[in-house]
Structures are given as structure tokens and as C-alpha cells.
Amino acid sequence: MTRFSRAAAAIVALLLAVPMAGLLPRTPSSRTVAEAGEAYLDFLKQDSLYLRMKLGLPIDRLPDVSLAKEEADARFAARWLTRLGEVRASDLDEDETLSLDILRRQLGAVRDAPHFHGLTFPVTPYASPFGLVNRAFSTFAIPDEGAARRYVALLRQMPAFVGAVRAELTAQAARGIRIPRDELAIAVPFVASLAGDAQTSPYAVVVERLATLPPSAATAFRADVAAVIEKDVDPPLRSLVDWLGGEYRAEAPEAVGLGQYPGGPEYYAWLVRLHTTMDVAPAQVHQIGIERVAAIDTEMKRVRERLGFAGTKPEFKAFLKKDARLFPRSPEEIGERLMGHIRRIEPKVDAFFLRRPKAPYGVRRLEPQLEPGQTFGYYNPPTAAEPIGYYYFNGSSLADRSLLNAAALIYHELVPGHHFQINLAYENRTIPPFRRETTDTAYTEGWGEYASALAGEMGMYEDPYDLYGRLSMEMFITLRLVVDTGMNALGWPRAKAVALMRENLMETDTQIETESLRYSCDIPGQALAYKMGALEILRLREKARTALGPRFDIRRFHEAVLGRGSLPMTTLERHIDWFIAQEKKR
């Protein structure tokens, strides 16, 4: 990866000059904001498995999913919000003001969380803490006998953890809150994939991970792990699977969506604000989605006409499903195609960005047990154990896995998408540490979607099939605004959402089934952040372009968006206003 020029470095220094002043607290209000940021980061380090893995901190306990823990966290947040309420905004510089905004929003979410406890299901593939728990075990470094003992000690916590998850599900059920029956068809196999004997359990340790242990110690360790799995870990997992698939399922609802549960409508409205980081209501988001879907549909029709296709949209979809060029012959080919698109965009980056992240990147296949519950995959930032940022792709069901939108997808995930956005912030040591380790969904996913669209301005969609793939991905992301709000706030049956998705999307029926459950039963509201965030970033770009006229430089705008880390959309607009004022002074 090439280094950026000295001139570009000087530009970055100018952009960062004022925010850097925030590194040294200047006033009592400055000190309060700095202390709150440090306390919040310490709070996150204590319990976040993701953060502990990323920072290379010891993993010595599994997550606490109880209401008591949420209430304790809320008390911590309330104390700091009280102190932050005494801060005088006029005493803060630009970067301190950003920190204050972020702390108030994120601590506010922690404070409010107990009010909605019991409305998230701990065994659905996206929301479940099992995903991070599995990764903690699978990436647990075992270089010596002390680490081996710590692994066994952590494994011994699994029965209590599984029991706590079951207790949460039982308490939910007592309130009339159960996982919908359709979602159980995914959740039960997901939990079942965690069970297994000493040879098949995902918590077993292959001998290759023990290369630095003395042979006798490795043998003893594997025997200990096998005994714990078969005696303590596997039985409660199998019991949970049997219960979910039997007694629990018998009373599970047919309907989907948060709106059916006590407190569900209020929780969903809160989630919409939380994930979009804007003061918008579900009905507003729904209408934005309807309007944008119509506009994208018109653009897709133009591309079909450009290709000389005279048939209908469903006929073109059927035509594409028969084009062998669009389907991989192996999981490895998926990775090769994705990285091929990355190699095409790399030479164009410097015309649009002042900096590149230092962290390397690549693609890998998802863990097979996670593939049934995930339509595509996810980006995993570098950690101490794995210093490369990887996009984990779904390598299953190859006959149904079209690569039509592979270019648009990987530009969203890696370059110039998540890998740029996450690592440019993490590598920028002028950003307060707590802000390098926290994100807002609308900013993170909004940037990913914006980056995918930006790739078109960088010349990546000259092939009409790549362009159609980009538009199909945009349709996929935008239709979420309609169906997520429809199922959770407007009382839509899942069948209505699925029918609309089948009419407008290129995805297979299997993918549509998975996605519709993700929106309605697993992580409602989260999918709204992608398009809402992207639309807001684009609006702010046009605001800056209009205000600056010929002085507008897209590289400097991108530096302003990315240079201070993840920001709520309302905070980002205030920061872009500050950026515009600074640019006018140049």
C-alpha cells in the first residue's frame, strides 16, 4: 500500500490542527469530558468480549445477560450523564464538543436499556452473544500452560452462561414474549451447532493450536477440555435445543415484529432513533424508503434497456439466474472475485482520499455453522490476535449465490468502506481512545453504503452488469426501510414483506427468508442505518459543495467525515458545519 504524499500529509495536519488541541484538557469542562471518556472506555473494557479480543486483553469471563447487570450499567451511565450535564459547551474546543455529544448519546442508550430488557432474543444468530463467545474460544491463544488453564476455566463457565440464556428466555415467555415460530427454524439449528462431543464441539481444541506446549501438557489439556465439554458444556446446550424445539416452540407466535409484544412499539421507535442516530419516526423512514425504492427501480429499468433486454424485471431476474458467469464454482472463487474487484479500485483511491489505513485486509469464508443464519457475511476489524481486517463471506449454497453484486458488496465492506472507516479512526491517535473503540451503526453502515455508491464515481461500475449489481444492492438496502418498519411498526405480516422483497430483489428465496427474519425477529431497526446513514452523508456532501463552491475538495470532505471517527449523524452535521467554516477561512 503506497504512502500518501507529503503535501497530503500537510493537508491532513491542517485539518487535524484544531481538534488536536482537545488532547490536553484546558478547562474544568474539558477535564470532565476527558474523564468521562476514560471512565466509559474502562467500563467497556471490563465486559465487551469484542473489545477485549481486539485489544488483546485476557478473556476471563463470559457475558452477563441479566437484568441486574443492565441495571448496574445504567446506574454507571446515569452518574456520568449527571456530571456531563454540568459541562459548559462554550468552554470546549471542537473535538471536545464531539466527545461530549457522543458520550451523551451512548451513555444515554446504556441508561435507557433496562427499560427494554427482555425484548431482544439471546439465541437468534445476529443478536445472540454466542457468536462472540464462540469467537473468543476459537481465537483464544494457548502458548503456554497458564493460558491452557485459563481456557479450561473459561470453558467451565459455559454451563452457567447457557443457564442464564435459558433463564432470560423463560422470563421473556412469562411476559408473553417468545421468539416467532419462523425464527425458531433458524435459532434452533444455530444453538444445535454449538453442541457436540469432545471431537465435534466448537469448543474443542485441535492439536495444531498447541504447538508451543510440551506434548504431555498438550495431551493433558485436551483431555481436560474433552471432559468439561462432555460433562458440563454439551448437556445444557442439548437441553436448551430440545426445550426450544419442543415445549417453547409449542407456544411460539406465528406473527413477527416487535409491535406484537408488551412495550414493543416503544422499543422499536427507540431502536429507530438509536440506529439511525437521527430524530426520526418509523413512519418517516417508511415513506423515505417507498420514494427511494421507486427511484432505484427506474434506474434499474434504464440499465436493462441499455443492455437491450426488452422483457420484464422478473424475466431479467430469471435470465441472470441462468448466467453461469455470475455463479461461483467453489468458495475459493468467491474470495478471488471479491479481491479482484479490490485490485481494480486500489489505484483510484488517492484521487478521493488523503489517507489510507495501515492495516492490511483480505477475505475469508465464514465459519460453516454461522452460514445458515447469515445472508452474506460481515467485516471483522483487526484484533491483537488477528492483525488483518477480513470480510467473512458466506461460501454455502453456491448454486444460489450470484456474484452480480460482488463489486458493490466488497467496496462496502473493505475499500473504501468499512476497512477504511474503522481503521483510519483506530489508527488516528489524536482521537480520544474511547472514540476509537466505539461506533454508531448509521455512521459505520452509512459509510459502507456511501462508499459502495462512491465506487461508481471512481469508475468501478462501467460494466452494466456491475452497475446493475450495484443498483440491486442499493435496492436491497433501501427496501429495508419499507419492510423493517412495515413488520415492526405497521403490523405487516411477514408474508407481505417477503412478497415485496421477491418482487424487487435479486436475492434468492432462501436469502429473502433469512433477511426478513433478521429484520423482524433478530435485530429490528439495525438495517435501517445503512441507507439512512448513507443518505445523510450524501446530503452533507452536497451541503458542503454548495457552501464552498469551487473550493470544495472531495478528499478533504472525506477526511472531515472519516478523520474524527464514528459520529452520530446529528453530530456529524454539526462537525461538517464546522469544517465548512474552517474551509472558508483557508
Q: At which residue positions do the language-model features occur?
A:
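N-terminal maturation segment of proteins
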Residues: 17-586
